[in-house]
Amino acid sequence: MKPKEFYLVVGRFVPENNYETMVREFMNSDTDKDFVLITNVEQNKFYEELREKTGFEKDKRIKFVGTVYDQELLKKIREDAYGYFHGHEVGGTNPSLLEALGSTQLNLLLDVGFNREVAEDGAMYWSKDNGSLSSTILSADQMTVEQLNQFEEKAKK
């Protein structure tokens, strides 16, 4: 994984975290960056369901890398990511969101109340509508260094 050449997601691999939307929308984007998924796919039936629904294995940009328990390594991976996807929509504020806001320069969050309450204007937002995340990825890819720095500053407030 080359620094700033990948989008990242970290979290439990369950349908309610909207992995299907993120994978499908990423596959429909024209980004040349990779999508690195740090999650528990081992012996997870949802992994096979997602593979069947999306055909993600045909997209070489999508990289399921398993789980990372070393917190220092995980922090470094977050810092190296170009952007972080957060698709959680249930359960309130998630620790992985707080960690991402504190260490990833650009965060692309599912547009739900608690994500907006936490990140405010320090993130970009997407919905589950067709084309929403893929167009947000396009906008993110076109950002200047100054724009990225502004998001980072706002996210850390």
Task: Give the predicted meaning of each segment.
Residues 123-131, 139-145:
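Conserved acidic donor-binding segment of nucleotide-sugar-dependent glycosyltransferases
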